[in-house]
Amino acid sequence: MCIRDSEYTVSFLAYIMWDPVHMYNAVTNDWKDVEHQITFDVRQPKTHEYTLKRLRKFIEDHPYVNVLRFTTFFHQFTLVFDELAREKYVDWYGYSASVSPYILKQFEEEVGYPFRAEYIIDQGYYNNQYRVPSKEFQDFQAFQRREVAKIVKEMTEITHECGKKAMMFLGDHWIGTEPFMEEFKTLGIDAVVGSVGNGSTLRLISDIEGVKYTEGRLLPYFFPDVFNENGDPVKEAKYNWVTARRAILRKPIDRIGYGGYLKLALQFPEFLDYVEQVCNEFRTLYANVKGTTPYCVKKVAVLNCWGKMRAWGCHMVHHALYQKQNYSYAGIIESLSGAPFDVVFINFQDILDNPAILDDIDVIINVGDADTAHTGGEWWENPKIIEAIRGFVYNGGGIIGVGEPSGHQYQGHFFQLANVFGVEEETGFTLGYDKYNWDEHEHFILEDSEEVDFGEGKKNIYALPSATILVQKEKEVQMAVNEFGKGRAVYISGLPYSFENSRVLYRAVLWSTHSEDELNRWFSTNYNVDVHAYPKNNKYCVVNNTDEPQQTTIYRGDGSSFELALEPNQIIWYEIA
């Protein structure tokens, strides 16, 4: 029975009549009179059988091909256009295009409870990565991973049987493969290639385990939107390479390449010259760092609801695209992608299952808006989570919170770790309490910085009496530190990616772990210049991340130092004496 003046939604399955990737390419490249391709539902028995036969025939008809690049297996991430050919909704991690009556019937039989459309629709939010995932949606994801893995394994076995290698493109129809989950290791994939938009998306590829090699497709694509008389492909290529290089120096991919229409690139000889330069630089880099672990000053754990499943993709709506609402948080992940830390991603369930998971962690980072999957939402109502995190810090661990860490209104607090961070958010409930802690203080964390860019920042944050304020603007705290037991906490309202902010984060990690004395080890006094060391290979390098000459003092691992001048974008390799 409907109630008058109430809103209702109607849930339904819509058949995809035009494959979203084909539609995207047609719209982007202004294709005319091209037949619309449909998406194969390879999970259907007849289509499944046909696809395997078609794969064998393709291999037989193309004996000169020795690597098959699958694009991909088998479900497209959520990508919807409107009636005006404009992009309407996109979620690079979206599962809503991976459903069909056949699949849903299988799901019900396996999990033992009826499927409801709301498990996918999720009030219209479609379980995007900002939503705290429900048990039912996580069950569906796990089911999809298992079923996708079975068919992928069949296809890679055929590929190997025919003497070929199987490569997967990390993009387009990749939903269900989930490279950081256990099922991926069963796929039989030889290699993974993916698009590199920045350091985070580079690590999405290079951190994948269980393959023989990884490859990054650098930008720009050889498409008319860049390769035209008004475009500057060299400028875009330089920015892309320097951004990706930071991450490559921490965890290298094995190969690099480009994609698009080659005839367009041929019209820009200066671009070809720069690509040659990049290739030569990559060869030297790869020879020096492959097979070794770079020096890591600390082990950092990013804590959210997704853990390793969304490693390096936190706060990413579309592939490496800017969003005003999240760049102040995504900057943390981007900084970590090229920083000298051992970075892991854990979720709250990991802590419940094994509290000892925190024993070898130096610093926990919780970053994002309140009541999102990135900060935890209702997970903070679980006393075992509170006990584990508070105990970790109290006994000497470090914690860094960005935005609204542990933000969830519950039992008299908005920040559930307010006494740990030493800050709280004014939501109106505590307006009657006077606040007297507003004085700013100099601090180790800010010694390299002039004025910190907090991005969008946060309003209405105030300090508790125990906290030390580093930056406040109009009585709104932007950065503060706090001692909690033997441990230390750092609060930052936001930290967009920049070289200066990466230095702020680096110093915050050192301070939170009582490691200020470790600053001058494999260190550059100029935050535009990075130092990466590879003790196993007796190599280290100094990298200028800018288009301008830089002067700096370089500290080696033993604390000795030397002065250095670098040319724009230059990388210099040294032997460790």
Predicted regions and their residues:
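A short, well-structured beta->alpha microelement
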Residues: M168-T177, I333-I357
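A glycine-rich, often tryptophan-bearing local segment used as a flexible ligand/cofactor-contacting loop or short
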Residues: G376-E451
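Hydrophobic targeting/anchoring helices
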Residues: R56, R69-T72, F77-V80, Y130-R131, ...
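Short acidic/histidine-rich motifs immediately flanking catalytic phosphotransfer sites
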Residues: I357-I364
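A short helix->loop->beta-strand "cap" motif at the edges of active sites that frequently abuts
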Residues: G163-K164, K212, N395-G398, G487
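Polysaccharide-binding and catalytic clefts of secreted carbohydrate-active enzymes
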Residues: R4-T186, L204, K290
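Extracellular ligand-binding/catalytic regions of CAZymes and related secreted enzymes
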Residues: L79-D82, R86-Y89, K263-V297, S337, ...
